[in-house]
Amino acid sequence: MSEIQRYLQLEISQQQNFLYPLIFQEYIYAFAHDRSFSKSILLENTGYENKFSLLIVKRLITRMYQQNPFIIFPNDSTQNQFFGHNKNFYSPLISEGFAVIVEIPFFIPLIPSLERKKTKIVKSKNLRSIHSIFPFLEDSFSHLNFVLDILISHSVHAEILVQTLRYWVKDASSLHLIRFLLNEYCNWNSFFILKKGSFCFSKRNQRLFLFLYNSHVWEYESIFFFLRNQSSHLESTYSRVLLERISLYGKIEYFVNVFGKVKDFQVNLWLVKDPCMHYVRYQRKSILASRGTSIFITKWKCFLVTFWQWHFSLWFHPRRIYINQLSKTLLEIWGYLSSVQINPSVVRSQILENSFLITNAIKKLDMLVPIIPLIASLANTKFCNVLGHPISKPIRADLSDSHIIGRFGRICRNLSHYHSGSSKKKSLYRIKYILRLSCARTLARKHKSTVRTFLKKSGSKLLEEFLMSEEDVLFLTFPKALSIFGVVYKSRIWYLDILCISDLVNYK
């Protein structure tokens, strides 16, 4: 770690020319291995000296440049003929180390700004929570009218990824190496899946995948930072830091060509400038909401498609960008169905002998549980059928009843915890019912009896932990909340401790 810190303290001119030698430094791969191990409790720590050896890295890169396809190892039929080693072994090796190296130039522009401002980055776990975005949506989206629902494609050509990194990584040798790796990964079908000349990311090599994908997406998202600074009178520190790039300002000069050749740049900028524009990206989707009219949001759609296509080599089919009215559509956001509902409120006002009825329309963001996708997910993991009827889940015979109940209970509590912000709890109750009855049928199947006979024989105490409702959990946490529970439980609750969504497939 100290070697990397000393490297970050070099001058920018030196940093741009010494990325490639870092590939041969053993501490880079040890650092990458330690970071990967610290994030996963399922990995077996066998020691990085057996996997991330400097000698292995040098031999790997030497064979890459020799390009001898006639190397055959009779002892290992699964070895790749080009590299002479197992692709499952070298794929994470070179990708994890290279991801750490190419991330270095992205941190360089942040260092001078933080030193000038003498600011410290405050790490807050609450801001990392998935639920932290929902209060923002409740405060902002209720005042907006239209939204652009953009479906981001994972299919990216390898050369586009290299060109994206070219603005940040000035080392030509590193760019040639990553271009070579992408082409070879295509042949391996381990890092990318080739589809009609483009690359689709697979689930392997997550670190390098996230880096390439986020850098590519941020490249065309950078236009929103510029427009936000032009529309807002408040200074954005991080936007100003990220905009210190020559490539972006060069592309901004072409705004005039999008809407016509007008000499006044501010006139063209006014066509797409909106102080109430909000942008949110999540998974493979991004949302651009505005308070403008339908004509304004249509101009935005045409602008984005044209600008991204001509200046970022990014093709967005117009049919992948949907214009929706918030009050008439349901948006899928992080496992919720959200829409803006208009609730009329009638107020009676009386002045002397005259009385008036005033009707006010109050907009409120409504969050619903997507019952159909959840049932489909439960059906895929064999908790129920496609119609939502609970079924028994095949399990190992050596598992105890308490272990089975604990697994079902954790899944039920996780779903209840995550979907606690739903405004209507009826769909959530149905999911709980499916899991509870599936647990009972699984235990009855294990004991070779019926559900009624098993529950009557075991008693209600057996499922007491699993059947513990949210009311009991709230009472145990806040004993004084009994009097106000009727109001609290029906309202939406956002938890700031949810960092990821548990996958039901992990149930075995």
UniProtKB/Swiss-Prot annotation:
Coiled coil: none annotated. GO terms for biological process: mRNA processing; RNA splicing; tRNA processing. Keywords: Chloroplast, mRNA processing, Plastid, RNA-binding, tRNA processing. The keyword tRNA processing applies. Pfam families: Intron_maturas2, MatK_N. GO terms for cellular component: chloroplast. It comes from the Eukaryota. Disulfide bonds: none annotated. InterPro entries: Domain_X, Maturase_MatK, Maturase_MatK_N. GO terms for molecular function: RNA binding. It is found in: Plastid, Chloroplast. Belongs to the intron maturase 2 family. MatK subfamily. Usually encoded in the trnK tRNA gene intron. Probably assists in splicing its own and other chloroplast group II introns. This is Maturase K. The gene is matK.
